[in-house]
């Protein structure tokens, strides 16, 4: 009888680490993260690039990846260069000419963390920069007038400010849809960096007039 008990106890002790290990694996929490956004999220041409979606020019060391690596998240990064708020809901044409699925399709009810950078392409960021390039420190600009400010002012109204105001509800709509699809997720919105000095100019490194910089 004692031998039987001893054998049972020994078997139980030997099995315990296996059972505990299996339980730990089964209950170990994983944090599911989704990266959404445009080129400022995707990191175009920063190597190494993501081969799964070459048309998005998405880096494997963009900020969604860096955050996920630091925090230990399981990441699904669908950020895509050139994306607008519309591309959150509908297919986007990548730089390779192929269709890119709507970014919001990556969200699940189990998603825990979402990062988002969007809106710059809605206001036409690239075109604005191109139009504002000045041929000399005092102008004219590529758009024609001496300053970019003059080009984007019509009837006394700042057209760029109007574009920004019109983009806000579009971003709000994206955030609302994220909440609907992933109600438990924590969403972080990363803005855009300041690329101009507070005052003055640094022509020709930044080929803009002092008026447009200030």
Regions found by a protein language model. Name each.
Residues 1-28:
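Secretory targeting and sorting signals
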Residues 12-19, 61-65, 190-192:
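Hydrophobic alpha-helical membrane segments, chiefly transmembrane helices and signal peptide h-regions
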Residues 25-82, 133-141:
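Serine-esterase "nucleophile elbow" of acetyl-processing enzymes
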Residues 39, 43, 66-70, 74, ...:
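Structured segments of extracytoplasmic/periplasmic soluble domains
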Residues 39-42, 73-74, 80-86, 120-125, ...:
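Solvent-exposed loop/turn segments at secondary-structure junctions
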Residues 45-50, 89-90, 202:
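Short acidic, glycine/proline-rich loop/turn micro-motifs
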Residues 83-101:
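Charged, often glycine-rich, active-site loop that binds/positions anionic groups
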Residues 101-214:
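Alpha-helical cap/lid subdomain in secreted, periplasmic
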């Amino acid at each position: 009888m004692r031998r039987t008990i001893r054998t049972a106890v020994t078997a139980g002790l030997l099995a315990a680490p296996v059972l505990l290990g299996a339980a730990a694996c089964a209950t170990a929490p994983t944090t599911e993260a989704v990266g959404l956004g445009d080129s400022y999220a995707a990191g175009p041409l920063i190597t190494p690039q993501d081969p799964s979606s070459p048309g998005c020019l998405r880096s494997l060391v963009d900020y969604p990846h860096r955050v996920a690596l630091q925090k230990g998240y399981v990441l699904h990064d669908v950020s895509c260069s050139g994306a607008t708020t519309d591309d959150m809901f509908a297919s986007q044409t990548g730089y390779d000419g192929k269709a890119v699925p709507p970014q919001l399709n990556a969200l699940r009810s189990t998603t825990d963390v979402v990062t988002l950078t969007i809106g710059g392409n809605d206001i036409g960021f690239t075109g604005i920069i191109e139009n504002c390039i000045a041929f000399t420190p005092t102008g004219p600009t590529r758009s024609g007038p001496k300053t970019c400010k003059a080009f984007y002012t019509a009837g006394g109204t700042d057209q760029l400010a109007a574009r920004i105001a019109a983009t806000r509800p579009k971003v709000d709509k994206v955030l609302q849809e994220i909440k609907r699809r992933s109600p438990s997720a924590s969403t972080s919105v990363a803005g855009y960096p300041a690329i101009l000095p507070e005052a003055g100019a640094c022509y020709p490194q930044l080929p803009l007039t002092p008026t447009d910089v200030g």
